[in-house]
Amino acid sequence: MKADELRKLDNEQLRAKLKDCYEELFNLRFQQVMGKLTATGRPRMVRRDIARIKTILRERELGIES
């Protein structure tokens, strides 16, 4: 997701999205180990989404608006 889309969500929605991303990353890693992962770039995209969400949550915690 784009950062602009994520900034429109409230904190609870962001935390739910973060949980979903972690679950997806877990499943992707499992598929990779089993040799069934076809979208090899997807884990990287999910990790970046996690970083975006964590950054937005931290900015809000510190009172930084972008």
UniProtKB/Swiss-Prot annotation:
Annotated GO CC locations: cytosolic large ribosomal subunit
Listed GO biological process terms: translation
Keyword line: Ribonucleoprotein, Ribosomal protein
Gene3D superfamilies listed in its UniProt record: 1.10.287.310
Molecular-function GO term, any one: structural constituent of ribosome
HAMAP family: Ribosomal_uL29
Protein's UniProt name: Large ribosomal subunit protein uL29
